[in-house]
Amino acid sequence: MDTKVETGGKCPVAHGPAGAKGRGNRDWWPEQLDVQILHQKNKIADPMGPDFDYAEEFRKLDYEALKSDLHALMTDSQDWWPADFGHYGGLFVRMAWHSAGTYRITDGRGGAGAGQQRFAPLNSWPDNANLDKARRLLWPIKQKYGNKISWADLFILTGNVALESMGFKTFGFAGGRADTWEPEELFWGPEGTWLGDERYSGERQLSEPLGAVQMGLIYVNPEGPNGNPDPIAAARDIRETFSRMAMNDEETVALIAGGHTFGKTHGAGDPSLIGAEPEGGALEDQGLGWKSKFGTGFGADTITGGPEVTWTQTPTRWSNFFFENLFNFEWELTKSPAGAHQWKAKNAEPSIPDAHDPSKKHLPTMLTTDLSLRFDPAYEKISRRFLENPDQFADAFARAWFKLTHRDMGPKVRYVGPEVPSEDLIWQDVIPPVDHPLVDDRDVADLKAKVIASGLSVQELVSTAWASASTFRGSDKRGGANGARIRLAPQKDWDVNHPAQLAKVLSVLEGFQQEFNAGQSAGKKISLADLIVLAGAAGVEKAAKAGGHDVTVPFTPGRTDASQEQTDVASFNALKPRADAFRNYLSGHQFMKPEEALVDRARLLTLTAPEMTVLIGGLRVLKAGQPEHGVLTRNPEALTNDFFVNLLDMRTQWAPVAGKEGVYEGRDRKSGELLWTGTRVDLIFGSHSQLRALAEVYAQSDIKEKFVKDFVAAWTKVMNADRFDLV
């Protein structure tokens, strides 16, 4: 076969570094708004096709047979990557933990929900070193069970089985994590080097929305902050990072101690002898990274990071040895063979087994971050309680592990499988099931008529429905209109929701709800959650009619109302918008530009660029949110394309307003008359070439009917974003 490569031409598709492919738009204009990010998870990249239903496939899985195969794998040590202590349990616990542990509550991104550990950058993070071996060990099982188990589910289930095979009783397991087929572009930090920490400002203030202390770590540096072996300083980092993963102090202690009851770390030799990570490896390495030149490169010679620590006397069995060792010994600072800071027990006898030589014993060892659980006052109190009450420790770890591995799955309606726990947990954002007949088309029409006759304005109806539904995050499937939590703390008090106006609208709607429900003889009811969305639909229909179009906004009942007791106020405050560009709202504390916040919010709502564009145009003329800017129409509360027509009108000249950052005024080019005011978010649709192209479509004279149709479709998508029962 002739393998000669012609060098005279170049492939027209961009590959490789900038020097090989030429400079892209973002290279020339690094501050350019990235709209393409809205078109990730494109179905074109999915080999399964549009009709594939993963949850349905999972239900066909021989679940017990799969678990049996996983149990057998735990002790089936392979020559190419031998199991520590003859058991892969510790490796697979770490794999599952690191799959889930990227979750961050600030924006709901990261986590185990899509199997992203298979892709860059996560597959090549320093903290994920040698987890490529864990995934390769799983491949024969994944190959056997095929599409009935996703990689995302398999990672977590394998972690559960690992715990069970080592004598621990887990809280349960839910399947339902469908794989994605390309790496998700996320902001993991500003650094350009592994383990960089430019993410801090001031007195060690970690930038939002980040949840780890250094680039390429899951949480904290196990040697201490920037390698400083100070357990108290490390405790601060631990508390910060674990809280950003939605864990409190008790859950944090349970997770660290529970995870470190098993397995070991690997720092057998000089880290400079480790080869490239998977994404930087040679073609013939076939995606395996971190090839080591130290000794055999595996087994007793394994180098994964710096420390060389085995925490307990029974690293393949559940025990309370972690806490017993932590408190029964005093600790002195030492270094691993790799030169990393770690701690060894003083005046102790060797009692820790060797991972590969049964004739050897070692001194108990700990990481700096382990000692934080003893020397931080709050952590110590919890740790001593767990030391004295092993049953409480086991229960806390089981629950915290379940939360860790399921936090980004959303409500329980998305859970599938025979081991789904029956207990409702408050972090699952519990919504009661429907227990009554639902409204029919005639009821819907009657209720719409009452809403319109109530005197509530289009702006009030649309704003309330949007406020209720737009909290949805496609990242961790939280928020949305279902549950009607807009009426509960904390959402009812958020500034972005205009509490006084919100209370007025909800009072009227609650009156209609009570009147309707009291008048039914067969138990039929409408929830406030449904009525809020229905009222918004009525408002949109009225606005469309005012714009010259008769439309019916689709409405599907079936939402229910959550209680305040089912709502964790602190947890829901994480959903509070710092910016909602759809309502032209901007709070004081920002970590991105307003137009970037627009794209970020659209991405969380799973909107495409055209959907985002049409919603902005419609919501502006309906005066949703902050009406003082961006209402580019002389006919407000009518659903028209005026926003785009007037934004793109060359008779208007825009200029920034002195003393009002991010606010602009549009004046008549000839007379200087003030016509409009707008924000950066408004003007981006005339400035950004891709968004301007979309705005031009909706500003055309022949597009008015399509504009209304597209707005209704995008509106309905947001209203139903959390209706997993409709999928």
From Swiss-Prot:
Binding site for heme b: 260
Co-factor(s): heme b
Active site positions: 98
Keyword line: Heme, Hydrogen peroxide, Iron, Metal-binding, Oxidoreductase, Peroxidase
Covalent link (Tryptophyl-tyrosyl-methioninium (Tyr-Met) (with W-97)) residue numbers: 219-245
Enzyme class at the top of the EC tree: oxidoreductase
Cofactor remark: Binds 1 heme b (iron(II)-protoporphyrin IX) group per dimer.
EC numbers for this chain: 1.11.1.21
Stretches the record annotates as Disordered: 1-26
Biological process according to GO: cellular response to hydrogen peroxide; hydrogen peroxide catabolic process
Protein origin, superkingdom: Bacteria
Stored PROSITE patterns: PEROXIDASE_1 (PS00435), PEROXIDASE_2 (PS00436), PEROXIDASE_4 (PS50873)
Site residues by UniProt (Transition state stabilizer): 94
One GO CC annotation: cytosol
NCBIfam families according to UniProt: cat_per_HPI, PRK15061.1
Free-text function comment from the UniProt entry: Bifunctional enzyme with both catalase and broad-spectrum peroxidase activity.
Protein name per the record: Catalase-peroxidase
Organism of derivation: Allorhizobium ampelinum (strain ATCC BAA-846 / DSM 112012 / S4) (Agrobacterium vitis (strain S4))
Native organism taxonomy: Bacteria, Pseudomonadati, Pseudomonadota, Alphaproteobacteria, Hyphomicrobiales
Annotated gene: katG
